[in-house]
Each structure stands twice: as C-alpha cells, then as structure tokens.
C-alpha cells in the first residue's frame, strides 16, 4: 500500500479545504471532495464529476482516495461475514459484518494486534503490530460491500480503541459530522478495557456509546485475566464513569465473558451489584469461545441464564449476547491476522 501519493480518506473537511487551497483550487472544492468521499463513497478521484477535469488531474497527481477492497471473506452459516482488509502499512485487519432481522452491525478494528494481552483473547496472542490511521479504520466501512445496509458500528474488533484514541476520535468525528457520514453517535459503540487518562478524554470528547470490558469485578482476579487492570483498575473505571450522565440517549454497557469456575459464582454476581450500584448501565454476558492452549472453559446455557436472572432481579439490566460467526472464528475474542498475513502473501506470490 505504500506509494508516494497521499490519501484523502480520513481527512476532515478543514483538511480537505486546505488540500484544495494548496493546489490552487477554490476552498469550496474541499466541500465537494468531502461529499464525494463520505456520502458517495467514490473509488477514484475521476468520479468527482462536479470538479473540473483539470482540477481532478491536478488532485490525482498528489492524492488518491485511499480505499482498498477486502483481500478475503469468510461466510458463517449464521450469515455473519468476516472480511480481511489490507492496511496502508501492508498489514491486515479483520472486520466482521453481522446481519440481523432489523439491523446490521459492523465490528471494526482499530489496531493490528493488541497490547492488552488479555488471557482469553486471540488478538492479544498475536501481539501488537501497529495502530491504524483513521483512513484505515474508515476503509473497513467505506469498502464494505454491505455498507448501505449498516445500522450500527462497534469498535470491538482487533485492538484497544483507547490506545489509538486520536485516530478513533477522528474516525468517529467523520462518521458523525454533517459533511461526513452524518450518522448519529448513538449508532456507534466504542469498547475499552479502561485505559488511564484516555477513557476520560473519550468520555468528554465523544457522544458515542461506551462498552467497558469488565469480565471480573474482583480486582486481583481481573488482573490475572487482564493485565490492563494494573494500569487502571475496574474500580477506578467505575468511579470515573459515575461523573457522566448515561440516563438519556448515551448508553453505558459492561461486557462480561463468563468462565467456568472463575467468574461465574454468586460471589461475583454480588460483587458486580455492589460495584455498579446507582450507575445507569446494562450488562452483556458473553459466551467464552475456546482458544488453543488457553486453560479456560465456558459455562452451560443454564448457568448463563441463572447469572443473568440474579443480576436482573437485583436491578442490573442484563442480557446474554448471541454468539455469531463462531464457525469462521469471527466471534468475540477470536480475531487474529497473524496466520492470514502469511496465507495472503503466499497466494500473491503464487499469482505473480
């Protein structure tokens, strides 16, 4: 993906106007570019037909759109599709399209790999290979074949969004701006384990929904599952969240993978109730999907339902999230591109 040209995808309206100005074009040309990019999703500069041919040629000398189609797609029996997208750095990320009866959700990645190294997550086992620029985050949406069907976007793919906050905020700003996709921020959810200093900034600068990966309410146990607990503990996270209003349109949720014999007891349920008491939130219980060489197990459906019912009866609105795409390794915690990179490059060499 590396070349001498610069990319337009991921630039704000102000930056597009500056591009136009630097090339000797009227400032309003930047607004025209924004519409072609973020509302028409053009694949080439030549498709921007209300910009003069001479100005298009001038623009194309230094810039290109910066959109890249998917390199691979896997289809689940339940309708979920996992796409493999190339990035500008030559690496790959996985993106999951999840259609349902009355909605279609896209799970996007914000990094290649992840630094958080959660015990139960395949992405963490890949290691960290880099943060995505806003253009690569947006490309997962821009180049999605089903882009016109999308109703929701969740930042729950590869990577920790708060560890790439500048680019995540830039991407969500473009998604919600009038010149951009013009989406309501209520259609976007950003997930986090809780990263010190970054979570506070996100809460203040974004109106998108927030999902916190809790997975265990007891700090010492959570630290064993999630090393990030040692940086910003779950109790600190909850105290920070108490400073914000989630009683209206903005939603706060907690993600909780239920592990057999680890975080599924009444002690844990009671600890959750104490921890979030008075906080306007919901809990999503998630089934654990087995990862090779990881000595963790999921619980039965009956146990999940008992845990849900106990929390609900004690005032914590709780649901069990349906698992989607498990047969193509697209479910929660299973995304990884370490193997795929080699497969794609081998295929490219065979085609050469």
What residue ranges belong to the model's regions?
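Auxiliary Fe-S-binding modules of radical SAM enzymes
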Residues: 1-93, 242-250, 258-352
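Short linear Ser/Thr-Pro motifs
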Residues: 76, 109-110, 191, 213
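Generic beta-strand structural signal
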Residues: 81, 93, 104-108, 116, ...
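Canonical Radical SAM [4Fe-4S] cluster-binding loop centered on the CxxxCxxC motif
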Residues: 99-136
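Ferredoxin-type iron-sulfur electron-transfer modules in oxidoreductases and energy-metabolism complexes
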Residues: 135, 139-147
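Conserved AdoMet/S-adenosylmethionine-binding subsite of the radical SAM
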Residues: 145-152, 157-321
């Amino acid at each position: 993906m590396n070349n001498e040209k610069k990319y337009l995808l991921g630039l704000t309206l102000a930056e597009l106007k500056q591009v136009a100005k630097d090339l000797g074009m009227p400032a309003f040309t930047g607004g025209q570019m924004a519409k072609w990019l973020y509302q028409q999703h053009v694949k080439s500069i030549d498709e921007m037909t209300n910009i003069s041919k001479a100005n298009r040629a001038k623009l194309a000398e230094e810039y290109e759109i910066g959109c890249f189609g998917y390199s691979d797609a896997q289809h689940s029996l339940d309708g979920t599709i996992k796409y493999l997208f190339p990035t500008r750095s030559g690496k790959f990320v996985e993106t999951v399209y999840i259609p349902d009866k009355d909605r279609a959700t896209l799970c996007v990645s914000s990094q290649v790999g992840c630094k958080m190294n959660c015990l139960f997550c395949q992405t963490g086992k890949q290691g960290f290979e880099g943060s995505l620029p806003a253009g690569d985050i947006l490309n997962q949406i821009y180049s999605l074949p089903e882009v016109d069907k999308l109703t929701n976007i969740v930042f729950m793919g590869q990577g920790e969004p708060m560890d790439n906050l500048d680019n995540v905020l830039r991407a969500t700003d473009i998604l919600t701006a009038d010149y951009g996709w013009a989406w309501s921020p209520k259609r976007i959810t950003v997930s986090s384990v809780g990263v010190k200093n970054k979570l506070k900034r996100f809460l203040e600068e974004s109106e998108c929904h927030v999902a916190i990966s809790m997975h265990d309410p007891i700090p010492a146990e959570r630290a064993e599952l999630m090393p990030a607990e040692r940086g910003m503990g779950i109790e600190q996270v909850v105290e920070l969240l108490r400073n914000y209003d989630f009683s209206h349109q903005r939603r706060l949720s907690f993600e909780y993978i239920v592990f057999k014999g680890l975080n599924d007891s009444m002690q844990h349920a009671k600890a959750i109730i104490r921890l979030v008491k008075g906080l306007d939130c919901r809990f999503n219980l998630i089934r654990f999907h087995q990862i090779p060489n990881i000595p963790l197990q999921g619980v039965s459906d009956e146990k999940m339902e008992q845990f849900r019912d106990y929390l609900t009866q004690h005032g914590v609105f709780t649901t069990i999230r349906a698992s989607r795409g498990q047969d193509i390794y697209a479910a929660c915690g299973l995304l990884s591109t370490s193997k795929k990179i080699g497969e794609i490059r081998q295929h490219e060499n065979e085609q050469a």
